[in-house]
Swiss-Prot record:
Family: Belongs to the pseudouridine synthase TruB family. Type 1 subfamily.
InterPro entries, per the entry: PsdUridine_synth_cat_dom_sf (IPR020103), PsdUridine_synth_N (IPR002501), tRNA_psdUridine_synth_TruB (IPR014780), TruB_C (IPR032819)
Keyword line: Isomerase, tRNA processing
Name of the protein in its database record: tRNA pseudouridine synthase B
Superkingdom assignment: Bacteria
The EC number(s) this enzyme carries: 5.4.99.25
Coiled-coil stretches noted in the UniProt entry, renumbered to this chain: none
CDD domains in UniProt: PseudoU_synth_EcTruB
Biological role: Responsible for synthesis of pseudouridine from uracil-55 in the psi GC loop of transfer RNAs.
Amino acid sequence: MDGIIPLYKERGMTSFACVSRLRQILKTKKIGHSGTLDPGVAGVLPICVGNATKVVDYLMQSGKQYQGELLIGFATTTQDLDGDKIEEKVVADEIPTSEILSAMNSLTGTIIQIPPMYSAVKVNGKKLYEYARAGETVERPKRQVTISKFELLSSKYDKKNKQQRIRFNVECSKGTYIRTLVVDLARKLGYPGVMSLLTRLKSGGFTLDQTLSLDDVRDAVATQTLQQYLYPLDYALKDYPQLTIQVAQWKKVQNGGWLSPSELNTSEKEIVLSFDGQVKALYHFDPKNKMYKPTKMFAVN
């Protein structure tokens, strides 16, 4: 069994638990996911099965889309509702929409983020959350991410609790920490804040309406209809230029051979090569040797 399943990860489950359950349902160990979702986050989690595990990295390259909520008025150790409260500041008056929009605009485009201590980023071979659980703080590597859209959906002031809730939609590059983004938004507004809710709407080119739940997958296996829900591995490569090669070229590709631009009749920097209706390899142009060489082999048969 080979293909990609756009899974709907339910809130409360880890991404690893989803993979573990699918291994039991599909009776195969060759399964991987593209892009971890925190346990408290629901939404799109592309799962690669069998030979499709070779395209996990390419699925992860695509942009993401999220919808969520920022709760302004206090901060926690984890930047979400799971952590211990470490700071509090009442929102005495409703924050105007104009200020929220201005702050969101300042966080749109290319920005620098520092990963939260409660994250899986490794420093000196150890995950940050392991340091955090031990009560240690370490210097974290900065990363550059792109926020292509940061949209205000609604804003609601809670007069009784002196807090404010902001619902948002965000489209971003891989590696973006939404928790950090919304906490930074709260800081720009002059308050501590936490991410109170998050759903991933898009990942790996898949949207929420394409997803299957674990129960859906189990039912499809029972009725022997899963194949119709599996996406081919070339779905992960759909944004690359495509080229169908002939027998002579395929024999070279099978052996990892290099190909000349004249053989492929292309000037693309990277290109997906198919033969006999199946994606076989990803090649890239080597300017030094002026030849196309293999980046990744997907099938040699």
